[in-house]
Amino acid sequence: MADLHQKQIIDKLQHIIFKDGTFLNKVISDIIIKGNNIGFSIDISGKNKLEAEELKAKAIDKLNEISEINKITIVFTESKPMEKKAQKPKHFVENVKKIILVASGKGGVGKSTISALIAQQLSLENYRVGIVDADIYGPSIPHIFGINEVPKTKDGRIIPITVKSIQVISIGFFVKDHSAIIWRGPMASKTIYQLLSVTKWDNLDYLIIDMPPGTGDIHLSMLENYHLDGVIIVTTPQKISEIDVIRSIDLYQKLNLPILGIIENMSYMFESNSGGHLSQKYNIPLIAQIPIMPQIADACDKSLPLTDLLTLPLKEYL
């Protein structure tokens, strides 16, 4: 009998509708039947209270048509909207139009070399370019650019070192050669903030950030605190690199940073094709596959322009 009464109640209310189009019988719950007495609740969240009272009266009239019912009790309920967690405002980097991350799932894939190549090529295309070496634990940008000096400061701001029109900053400028940097995540993240926001950039079109490998504190700090325009992911053909890159892709997708493309470095030496697989699986453009070239390593060691050896189709992706 209880089931029959529940169906009768729902059926009786099916033609009572709120002005916003909500059917009354779709927002009732907690139907209780005790003998000939019934009760239920109506969720009036976001509804006009006067209209709700009018529809409640209509509901009672309709239910009184069921002869078995003696007493009707209807209560209103209202769910509180979930409070949105206040989002911390993200920083813009002064005098920088676009920020592009260059990232990888693991170390040793040539990420810093690719970062330098991207910066050098954009500079040759007459863009104003800067590069930040955010690989706190293994800074190699100073070596690639042949920089052995410490940046100057002015009015409390760091002046980046300019090499062939590219403005360069790195934690490597501030530590002794071969010294280990032993910092926990918060200290490393604070240092990245100083490299980005305390540096006095001179009207950049692009700021390229050479990220540390992995998906740690520095990555989260960057994604949560700065307005970023996209990330280029560097991989190598081996399966082990592909596995680690998938974690990076997952991070950037979850935090809604556009993945501009994948660059596969050290290509054609191995049977596997990590860059191609990832491109197809995640529908991410494969920007380039760069073969192993001894000349590239030699150019990095001698701080020679990488653009003399190869170029990337950047205009299609940035």
UniProtKB/Swiss-Prot annotation:
Coiled coil: none
GO MF assignments: 4 iron, 4 sulfur cluster binding; ATP binding; ATP hydrolysis activity; ATP-dependent FeS chaperone activity; metal ion binding
Entry keywords, A to Z: ATP-binding, Hydrolase, Iron, Iron-sulfur, Metal-binding, Nucleotide-binding
GO biological process: iron-sulfur cluster assembly
Xref: InterPro entries: Mrp-like_CS, Mrp/NBP35_ATP-bd, NUBPL-like, P-loop_NTPase, YlxH/NBP35
Pfam assignment, any one: ParA
Signal sequence extent: none
Annotated TM spans: none
Tagged with keyword rRNA-binding: no
Domain of life from the UniProt record: Bacteria
Residue positions binding ATP: G105, K106, G107, G108, V109, G110, K111, S112
Family: Belongs to the Mrp/NBP35 ATP-binding proteins family.
Quaternary structure and interacting proteins, as annotated: Homodimer.
Function: Binds and transfers iron-sulfur (Fe-S) clusters to target apoproteins. Can hydrolyze ATP.
Protein name per its UniProtKB record: Iron-sulfur cluster carrier protein
UniProt organism field: Rickettsia felis (strain ATCC VR-1525 / URRWXCal2) (Rickettsia azadi)
Gene that encodes the chain: mrp
